[in-house]
């Protein structure tokens, strides 16, 4: 998941916890740890490939790091280059034809029985945040390769009804250049040519960094990386949930209904800097007090939009209802100047992260919040500047793809567990994924995998071995029933 879109995922998932519990009432006692028993002997479950080898590969990839003592693998770093070679080897082992494009994405493709048909893309990202867990992104890559290898050893790979291409995207987290989806964005064709001019903290531009890695790229060649929409049938991504819902309801897998849209704001409040002991309270123009009031207003607005959101023709009843179940707002950074205990600040800056599945509702919240921020500034005789730093629309997953993924997950879990009385849960994603970028190219579907405690972007991130198995088996079932 993108670090730029990762804050407060817990709260968004929690909004859907009640729904999941109601839709799967007896799930809490199921799948708490699937008993393997005789499953080891089932040839159709491929435990050696889909579990043992897949888990071993995840741990092997988790050791490919630029840092000593923790996992860090950023865009085209030395560790990333080693990961590229490793992933290519695994793809070739699965019978796939491989190549690396000019943005560092690793591709593995099989044409199947009809090379001219629209291709299914399956992927996730191979980069990580700093001090990362080893399942974020990597699970989606490894599970796809494992499923195709199972088909390869079973003689079914060339019988696929359409081409299938696994893509390990080079950069989703945006750690080095502070811009997300460099890998998937190139494939989707949503990166402007000016992307190559973006610099890191050392003032090294992306195009120069690529040249350092023996990749010559121009604005023209960047645009040529875009896939022809007519050549692509759809995109599927398997990813850890990065939240607690699946663990709470006792299901290893869940289908993603959609990905929340996100807006990031930077608010700067300027007042009158002064001595903390000599300026009377009644005479202060304190930007910290103004910022504090604004943050409380934000919390009230986002906790209870039905009570605090003004309608003003910007927000319908249905939009407010949607916001009440999906809206989350976070102030993640705050700084003061000069930041001294005995000085009234002259300036306060803070960030606002707003996410919701309803784009109109999110825009209504931004409109109302901005209006109230300026009103508070006027009341307190301070000045305010609101900057829009990032905006991404919500993505609704394709209903047909989601239905197929749900059937595949159900089939996999039934094979592993036996009779299942409840439906596979459906969840929203509060975090951003490569599927958001690829949605500009084709229809998308996502499958979530349970992770312990909902923890992600942390060394404590963990997925049970049998849940890796379930994810790979569900991917295999999806591929075997591909239309």
UniProtKB/Swiss-Prot annotation:
SUPFAM superfamilies, per the entry: Bacterial exopeptidase dimerisation domain (SSF55031), Zn-dependent exopeptidases (SSF53187)
Gene Ontology MF terms: allantoate deiminase activity; metal ion binding
Tissue specificity statement from the Swiss-Prot or TrEMBL entry: Expressed in stems and leaves, and at low levels in roots. Not detected in nodules.
InterPro entries, sorted: Amidase_Cbmase (IPR010158), ArgE/DapE_CS (IPR001261), Bact_exopeptidase_dim_dom (IPR036264), Peptidase_M20 (IPR002933), Peptidase_M20_dimer (IPR011650)
Binding annotation for Mn(2+) 2: 136, 173, 457
Pfam family, one: Peptidase_M20
Annotated transmembrane regions: none
Statement: the UniProt record of this protein carries the keyword Signal: yes
Cofactor note (record): Binds 2 manganese ions per subunit.
Cofactor list: Mn(2+)
A GO BP annotation: purine nucleobase metabolic process
Amino-acid positions noted as binding Mn(2+) 1 in the UniProt annotation, renumbered to this chain: 125, 136, 239
Quaternary context: Homodimer.
Described purpose of this protein according to its UniProt entry: Involved in the catabolism of purine nucleotides. Can use allantoate as substrate. The sequential activity of AAH, UGLYAH and UAH allows a complete purine breakdown without the intermediate generation of urea.
Protein name (Swiss-Prot/TrEMBL): Allantoate deiminase 2
Organism: Glycine max
């Amino acid at each position: 998941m993108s670090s730029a879109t990762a804050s407060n995922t817990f709260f968004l998932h929690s909004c859907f916890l009640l729904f999941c519990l109601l839709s799967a009432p007896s799930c809490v006692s199921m799948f708490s740890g699937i008993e393997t028993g005789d499953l080891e002997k089932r040839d159709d479950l491929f435990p050696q490939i889909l579990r043992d080898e897949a888990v071993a590969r995840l741990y092997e990839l988790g050791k490919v790091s630029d840092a000593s003592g923790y996992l860090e693998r950023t865009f085209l770093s030395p560790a990333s280059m080693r990961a590229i070679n490793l992933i290519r080897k695994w793809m070739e082992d699965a019978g796939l034809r491989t190549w690396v494009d000019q943005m560092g994405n690793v591709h593995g493709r099989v044409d199947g029985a009809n090379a001219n048909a629209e291709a299914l893309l399956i992927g996730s990202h191979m980069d990580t945040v700093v001090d990362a867990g080893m399942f974020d992104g990597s699970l989606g890559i490894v599970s796809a390769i494992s499923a195709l290898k199972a088909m390869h050893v079973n003689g079914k790979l060339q019988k696929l009804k359409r081409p299938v291409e696994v893509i390990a995207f080079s950069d989703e987290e945006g750690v080095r250049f502070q811009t997300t989806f460099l890998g998937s964005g190139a494939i989707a064709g949503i990166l402007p040519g000016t992307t190559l001019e973006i610099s890191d903290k050392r003032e090294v531009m992306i195009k120069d960094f690529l040249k350092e890695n023996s990749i010559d790229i121009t604005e023209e060649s960047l645009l040529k990386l875009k896939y022809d929409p007519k050549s692509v049938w759809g995109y599927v991504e398997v990813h850890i949930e990065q939240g607690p819902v699946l663990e709470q309801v006792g299901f290893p897998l869940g289908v993603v209904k959609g990905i929340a849209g996100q807006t990031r704001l930077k608010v700067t409040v300027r007042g009158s800097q002064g001595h903390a002991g000599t300026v009377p309270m009644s005479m202060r123009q304190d930007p910290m007090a103004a910022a504090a009031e604004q943050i409380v207003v934000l919390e009230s607005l986002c906790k209870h939009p039905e009570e605090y959101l003004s309608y003003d023709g910007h927000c319908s009843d249905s939009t407010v209802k949607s916001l009440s179940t999906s809206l989350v707002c976070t102030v993640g950074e705050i700084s003061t100047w000069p930041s001294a205990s005995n000085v009234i600040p002259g300036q306060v800056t803070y960030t606002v992260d707003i996410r919701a599945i309803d784009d109109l509702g999110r825009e209504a919240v931004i409109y109302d919040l901005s209006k109230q921020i300026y009103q508070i500034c006027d009341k307190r005789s301070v000045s305010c500047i609101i900057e829009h730093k990032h905006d991404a629309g919500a993505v609704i997953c394709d209903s047909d793809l989601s239905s197929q993924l749900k059937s595949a997950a159900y089939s996999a879990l039934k094979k592993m567990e036996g009779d299942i009385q409840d439906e596979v849960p459906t969840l929203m994603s509060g975090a951003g994924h490569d599927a958001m970028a690829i949605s500009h190219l084709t229809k998308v579907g996502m499958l979530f995998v349970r992770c312990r405690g909902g923890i992600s972007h942390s060394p404590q991130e963990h997925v049970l071995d049998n849940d890796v198995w379930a994810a790979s088996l569900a991917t295999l079932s999806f591929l075997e029933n591909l239309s």
